[in-house]
Curated annotation (Swiss-Prot):
Organism: Homo sapiens
Keywords assigned: Antiviral defense, Cleavage on pair of basic residues, Cytokine, Glycoprotein, Growth regulation, Pharmaceutical, Pyrrolidone carboxylic acid, Secreted, Signal
UniProt-listed SUPFAM superfamilies: 4-helical cytokines
Protein name: Interferon gamma
Keyword Signal among UniProt keywords: yes
Localization annotation: Secreted
Gene: IFNG
């Protein structure tokens, strides 16, 4: 009886192990489809190094990586937009975009819509240029870490002051 249970356990391991190949994220199959479409599996693609992977390896801190990832995701959205009418890869593109939505935007539609709005602004549009310059000082203030930490210190000091006076 002991050997029978070992054999059944072994067979179960084999079945579960073989299922692992089929349980990949949906984007893997679709990315392979895009590789075939773009002939991206050829050795000449590796010439002159990588586009994104080397950059991502340079940044270890999560906030820095998010900045780089946002630019990379923006690139892919623009790339996919160029091929939106190509029916042979439409399913692959949509699957990958949806998976990016889940992974990068945490399935937050508002965040994704705002991100796409930002990436779709044309820097050659005069109206966009004027609005961007008009908002520049406020945007720069938002970027400054000193402005954010200064507010936090003030509110902490007020809180501590109240505690001391009580």
């Amino acid at each position: 009886m002991k050997y029978t249970s070992y054999i059944l356990a072994f067979q179960l391991c084999i079945v579960l192990g073989s299922l692992g190949c089929y349980c990949q994220d949906p984007y893997v199959k679709e990315a392979e489809n895009l590789k075939k479409y773009f002939n991206a599996g050829h050795s000449d693609v590796a010439d002159n190094g990588t586009l994104f992977l080397g950059i991502l390896k340079n940044w270890k801190e999560e906030s820095d990586r998010k900045i780089m990832q946002s630019q990379i995701v923006s690139f892919y959205f623009k790339l996919f937009k160029n091929f939106k009418d190509d029916q042979s890869i439409q399913k692959s593109v949509e699957t990958i975009k949806e998976d990016m939505n889940v992974k990068f935007f945490n399935s937050n539609k508002k965040k994704r819509d705002d991100f796409e709005k930002l990436t779709n602004y044309s820097v050659t549009d005069l109206n966009v240029q004027r609005k961007a310059i008009h908002e520049l000082i406020q945007v720069m203030a938002e970027l400054s870490p000193a402005a954010k930490t200064g507010k936090r210190k003030r509110s902490q000091m007020l809180f501590r002051g109240r505690r001391a006076s009580q």
